[in-house]
């Protein structure tokens, strides 16, 4: 096939022409990965693109916003370039996937999708979020939470490896977002510092 669709088994389709919506962007030469709007079962946003450098690494933008909310500057109602998207539902041309050597298996669970998207960006492509393809994501239903000591250790190891691999890019920040945002929040709050 020409396109690959990475799709978690804990998702449920909401919009009927979601695959066509994703292909519309994935077929464009400049586009690497395409991600969708993922909702929690309570109809709040789980994923609408990933902000890079947030919460020290990466975070889902608009997380927990209500489904009908337009988002910061309307970003929940139009397709746009984003730094990364989640592999819970990600489409990419097979040629791009092969060009960057696919997912890095050393990131067993955490950051494998963000690492992949950064490598796609480094290869000269852009990643796109579309709000017109929507799915429910029953997050962590299939793999569970990272609460056991072994899972916690694996997660911490993946965090460290990600920080080492992408230190330069993390320091540069996310060109798709305003550099004045508070990077410790996912809600587009500005980091306002008092004048001295």
Task: Kindly label every feature range from the protein language model.
Residues 1, 34-37, 130-131, 138:
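Short glycine/serine/threonine-enriched helix-capping/active-site loop
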Residues 1-2, 28, 102:
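Active-site acidic short loop of glycosyltransferases
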Residues 1-14:
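Short beta-strand-to-loop acidic/aromatic patch adjacent to the donor-nucleotide binding site
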Residues 2, 32, 83:
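Conserved acidic residues
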Residues 8-10, 34, 93, 107, ...:
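Generic structural signal for small/hydrophobic residues in well-ordered secondary structure
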Residues 11-55:
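Conserved donor NDP-sugar-binding/catalytic core segment of glycosyltransferases
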Residues 18-22, 76-101, 105-136:
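A short, conserved alpha-helix in the catalytic core of glycosyltransferases
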Residues 42, 54-81, 91, 127, ...:
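C-terminal, non-catalytic tails of nucleotide-sugar-dependent glycosyltransferases
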């Amino acid at each position: 096939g020409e396109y690959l669709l990475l799709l978690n088994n804990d998702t449920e389709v909401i919009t009927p022409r979601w695959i066509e919506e994703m292909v519309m962007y994935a077929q464009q030469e400049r586009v690497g990965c395409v991600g969708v709007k993922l909702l929690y079962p309570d109809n709040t946003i789980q994923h609408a693109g990933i902000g890079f450098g947030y919460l020290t690494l990466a975070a889902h933008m608009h997380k927990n916003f209500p489904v009908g909310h337009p988002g910061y500057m309307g970003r929940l109602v139009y397709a746009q370039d984003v730094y990364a998207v989640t592999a819970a539902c990600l489409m990419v041309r097979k040629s791009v996937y092969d060009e960057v050597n696919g997912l890095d298996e050393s990131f067993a669970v955490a950051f494998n999708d963000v690492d992949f998207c950064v490598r796609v960006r480094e290869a000269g492509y852009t990643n796109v979020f579309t709000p017109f393809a929507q799915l429910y994501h029953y997050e962590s239903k299939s793999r569970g939470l990272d609460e056991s000591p072994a899972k916690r250790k694996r997660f911490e190891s993946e965090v460290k490896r990600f920080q080492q691999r992408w230190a330069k890019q993390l320091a540069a920040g996310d060109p798709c977002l305003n550099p004045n945002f508070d990077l410790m929040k996912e809600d587009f709050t500005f980091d306002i510092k008092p004048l001295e």
